Regions:
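Short, flexible turn/loop "capping" segments at secondary-structure junctions
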Residues: 1-4, 108
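Conserved beta-strand termini and adjacent loop/short-helix elements that scaffold enzyme active sites
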Residues: 36-38, 108, 173-175
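Small-residue-rich helix-loop
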Residues: 77-115, 119-120, 132-146
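Short glycine-biased active-site loop of nucleotidyltransferases that positions the nucleotide triphosphate
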Residues: 1-2, 45, 118
Length: 198
């Protein structure tokens, strides 16, 4: 924002007039603000996207190590696209279950935030290490010791409840990674090295 790079945000308030007031105060030519009264949808979307961005990041780490590096770097994107599709589907189910609106997931708080996190976030970086075969605790100690990884912490906290309430496979898979190798998890879930079966 300091450099006036174009970006957008979403303001959630049950009182839509209040949201409009805030929108008028902070919107600029380069800072666009959308508004919604779907507070739970925005809150849940922005939180759980961290879990999914971690799992999508694992796609790069899980690329077939026997393939040439240039092939790994190019084609894990197809794997990521498949995981993004599955992630958004689960996010819709999750958000609607807890009182949010599906359209919120397809907006800035869901799909938009997920995209940013996957492209350059801390959670996707942790996912890459998990995909390479590191356990979470080892990757945290070796590479991200002083960095907060919200997706991992949230997955550990809500994983069991999600399994009970929704059977959301990707969240549960991510939660299991805490004590197991990602490649082992992939095999248990009948997923091959590039998640093609997803």
């Amino acid at each position: 924002l300091a450099h006036k790079m174009r970006t957008s945000t979403v303001i959630a308030n049950e009182n839509i007039k209040k949201a409009q007031e805030i929108q008028s105060l902070i919107s600029t030519e380069y800072y666009k603000c959308e508004i919604t009264n779907d507070v739970p949808g925005v809150e849940f979307s922005s939180a759980i996207k961290n879990i999914y961005s971690m799992l999508i990041g694992a796609a790069e780490g899980l690329s077939n190590p026997s393939a040439p590096i240039e092939i790994q770097k190019k084609f894990y994107l197809n794997t990521s696209a498949s995981l993004i599709h599955r992630s958004i589907s689960e996010m819709v189910e999750f958000v609607c279950y807890y009182g949010g609106k599906s359209e919120t997931v397809y907006g800035l708080a869901g799909l938009g935030d997920l995209y940013v996190s996957v492209i350059g976030g801390r959670n996707s970086m942790m996912g890459k290490y998990l995909g390479q075969g590191y356990l979470y605790k080892d990757a945290k100690e070796l590479f991200m010791k002083d960095i907060t990884v919200e997706g991992a912490e949230l997955a550990f906290e809500i994983g069991p409840k999600i399994l009970k309430d929704l059977k959301a496979k990707l969240i549960v898979t991510t939660q299991q990674v805490g004590g197991q190798n990602m490649n082992k998890i992939a095999k248990q879930q009948n997923i091959n090295d590039n998640f093609i079966k997803l």
